Amino acid sequence: MFALRTAARPAARSVGATRNYATLREIEMRLKSIKNIEKITNTMKIVASTKLGKAQRAMATSKVYNEASEKVFENSETAVPENIEKRLWVVVSSDKGLCGSIHSQLARTVRRKLLDFESGEKLIDIVAVGEKIKAQLGRSNPEQMRLSFGGTGKEAPTFEEAAHIADEILALDTQYDDIEIVYNKVLSGISFEPIMKESYSAKAIEDAPKFGQYELEDDVVKNLADFSLANTIYAAMAEGHAAEISARRNAMDNASKNASDMINKYSILYNRTRQAVITNELVDIITGASSLE
């Protein structure tokens, strides 16, 4: 009977030891996975930090042209027409993710403003620049989507890209009384805000009080309106790109910090579990030695 009891104890201890070893392996695998994630997020943060300088320089360059254009319209007292029949919003985003809530916040702002502006059967048409905003607004407002453009966000935008988008918009069969650009404006290194910027139509320029003092040819007014649209889109794309890169850097920085915290917690848990395994093994050895005495 004594022999049966001593034989049963090692079997029970063996099950406990096996469970501890299995837990230890699980923790070790989880720890390895989190460390790999931390390496990836750290690398992405470094890449974003490197790209941010180029994006900020592109934003500064675009602002120089855009501010000069805005000054012309400000001095000429150009204003939005009072009776607007057709509106178009050009929503500027990009194709890339892993940058926090920057795309979803822009989409929420557009949806909210659409509810504020629309009345009756009149719908505001939308042009989506970037696959992210196209996907979000395409699900909620598919009937308002007129055009969409992909391939944005990989590099700092250029005026040629903005001019191509403007040409496609102007080639639409609808004559819009008002065109506004919706994009993310950089407030600081860690914050941004979706805003709307006006792009004046040829009619708005013709009706401006101080432009009316000059005899301008129709081609001049049209070219000025077309250039203004391309210029405004370019400025929005450049600033939106800088906001996105900054948001991605911050998101990857937060992810790296969270991964580091998890690594510390799992390291402590791993060491405690390992210590428990060693302690159990020592208990088994001592118990076995005592039973042989």
UniProtKB/Swiss-Prot annotation:
Q: Which PROSITE patterns match?
A: ATPASE_GAMMA
Molecular function terms from GO: proton-transporting ATP synthase activity, rotational mechanism; proton-transporting ATPase activity, rotational mechanism
From what superkingdom does this record's organism come? Eukaryota
| Protein name as annotated | ATP synthase subunit gamma, mitochondrial
Topology of this chain in the membrane: Peripheral membrane protein
Quaternary arrangement and interactors, per the entry? F-type ATP synthases have 2 components, the catalytic core F(1) and the membrane-embedded component F(0), linked together by a central stalk and a peripheral stalk. The central stalk, also called rotor shaft, is often seen as part of F(1). The peripheral stalk is seen as part of F(0). F(0) contains the membrane channel next to the rotor. F-type ATP synthases form dimers but each monomer functions independently in ATP generation.
What PANTHER family does the entry give?
ATP SYNTHASE GAMMA CHAIN (PTHR11693), ATP SYNTHASE SUBUNIT GAMMA, MITOCHONDRIAL (PTHR11693:SF22)
Extract the transit peptide range from the record. Answer: 1-21
Task: Return the GO cellular component terms, semicolon-separated.
Answer: mitochondrial inner membrane; proton-transporting ATP synthase complex
Q: Does the entry feature the keyword Signal, yes or no?
A: no
The UniProt entry's sequence similarity note says: Belongs to the ATPase gamma chain family.
Q: Main role?
A: Mitochondrial membrane ATP synthase (F(1)F(0) ATP synthase or Complex V) produces ATP from ADP in the presence of a proton gradient across the membrane which is generated by electron transport complexes of the respiratory chain. F-type ATP synthases consist of two structural domains, F(1) - containing the extramembraneous catalytic core, and F(0) - containing the membrane proton channel, linked together by a central stalk and a peripheral stalk.
- Kindly state a single biological-process term from the GO annotations of this entry: proton motive force-driven ATP synthesis
What is its subcellular localisation?
A: Mitochondrion inner membrane
Q: Which NCBIfam families match?
A: ATPsyn_F1gamma (TIGR01146)
Keywords of this protein's UniProt record, alphabetized? ATP synthesis, CF(1), Hydrogen ion transport, Ion transport, Membrane, Mitochondrion, Mitochondrion inner membrane, Transit peptide, Transport
